[in-house]
């Protein structure tokens, strides 16, 4: 199912998902450094593999994904299938509601 068919996202639920599943490797605050994964500030509308100061896999650079709700929704289902060769070890979020919630949180927190 595509993002067009996704349930409405709840950014408060997404905040919990981010803290539990993403925050050990990612930050969202402007000016915050990179961790194991890149800082996600300014994520929406950015091309994959382009955050300054972070060493991306060739796969991430070459895929040239434009990050928006629809691409994140597909990517977060199974990152290694969406970008084979990505360094991201996270297996993905199988539930559409979890992905929609996380995207709602990211849309607000990374702007």
UniProtKB/Swiss-Prot annotation:
Residue numbers of N-acetylalanine PTMs? 1
**What GO annotations for molecular function exist for this entry?**
electron transfer activity; heme binding; metal ion binding
PTM text: Binds 1 heme c group covalently per subunit.
Q: Kindly give the Pfam families that the UniProt entry links to this protein.
A: Cytochrom_C (PF00034)
User: InterPro entries recorded for this chain?
Assistant: Cyt_c-like_dom (IPR009056), Cyt_c-like_dom_sf (IPR036909), Cyt_c_1A/1B (IPR002327)
Q: Which residues bind heme c?
A: 22, 25-26, 88
Protein's cellular compartments: Mitochondrion intermembrane space
UniProt keyword annotations, A-Z? Acetylation, Electron transport, Heme, Iron, Metal-binding, Methylation, Mitochondrion, Respiratory chain, Transport
Gene Ontology CC: mitochondrial intermembrane space
Which Gene3D superfamilies does the UniProt record give? Cytochrome c-like domain
Q: PTM N6,N6,N6-trimethyllysine: at which residues?
A: 80, 94
Q: What does this protein do?
A: Electron carrier protein. The oxidized form of the cytochrome c heme group can accept an electron from the heme group of the cytochrome c1 subunit of cytochrome reductase. Cytochrome c then transfers this electron to the cytochrome oxidase complex, the final protein carrier in the mitochondrial electron-transport chain.
Q: Which family does it belong to?
A: Belongs to the cytochrome c family.
Indicate what this protein is called per its UniProt record: Cytochrome c
Organism annotation: Tropaeolum majus (Common nasturtium)
Higher taxonomy: Eukaryota, Viridiplantae, Streptophyta, Embryophyta, Tracheophyta
């Amino acid at each position: 199912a595509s993002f067009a068919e996704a349930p409405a996202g709840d950014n408060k639920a997404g905040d919990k998902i981010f803290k539990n599943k993403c925050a050990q490797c990612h930050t969202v605050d402007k000016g915050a450094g990179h961790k194991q994964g890149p800082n996600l500030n300014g994520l929406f509308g950015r091309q994959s593999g382009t955050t300054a100061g972070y060493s991306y896999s060739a796969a991430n650079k070459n895929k040239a994904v434009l990050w928006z709700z629809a691409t994140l929704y597909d990517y977060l289902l199974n990152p290694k299938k969406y970008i084979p060769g990505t360094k991201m070890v996270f297996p993905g979020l199988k539930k559409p509601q979890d992905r929609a919630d996380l995207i709602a949180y990211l849309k607000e927190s990374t702007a």
